[in-house]
Amino acid sequence: MNWQQAVETTVTGMGYELVECERSARGLLCVYIDRVPGSVYLTGPGEFVLVEDCELVTRQLRYLFEVENVDYSRLEVSSPGLDRPLRKVGDFLRFLGSDVDVTLKAPFQGRKNYRGLLRQAGDTPEQGFELVFQDGKEDKVLGFALDEVREARLVPVVDFKGRMRQTADAPQGAAQETGGHEE
């Protein structure tokens, strides 16, 4: 078993999804993990990867690498981020209804890059997927199969409104955190 298979077996055995695994020329191993929807984790509930999840996986992988004699200088375990890559059929199915950036291998109507809403083309994943995107003022649909895709990523959605609302809802005399000083 090579080191990538060992990493995948370990990560999935712990209940996480292995999103990506890369090795740089200088011995850096980067492992990107995600939580599986509907699973229960020792580190607590939620759909997003926590620092504690990364710590658990890091600890387990260090033991594995010692036993398997894997040569590396540094190990980084991280979440895939807000712009998570979509690689497998399961990734596309999981994020149906999400905004996605898709780069095609070959241009279609003079373009390779598309951004739009991800849908399933038919009743089964084998029938491919669709991207509903705006071209000018009208919606258009791009149908594609996974083997036509060079890269696909979620469009990052950052919402700061929740934090602002909490600050605005604070009682008038309550101290807010401003570098350890009260205002």
Swiss-Prot record:
HAMAP family, per database record: RimP
A Gene Ontology biological process term: ribosomal small subunit assembly
Function (record text): Required for maturation of 30S ribosomal subunits.
NCBIfam families reported in the protein's UniProt record: PRK00092.2-1
GO cellular component term, pick one: cytosol
Localisation per UniProt entry: Cytoplasm
Pfam families, alphabetized: DUF150_C, RimP_N
Main location: cytoplasm
Protein name: Ribosome maturation factor RimP
Keyword tags: Cytoplasm, Ribosome biogenesis
InterPro entries with a match to the protein in the record: Ribosome_maturation_RimP (IPR003728), RimP_C (IPR028998), RimP_C_sf (IPR036847), RimP_N (IPR028989), RimP_N_sf (IPR035956)
Family: Belongs to the RimP family.
Domain of life: Bacteria
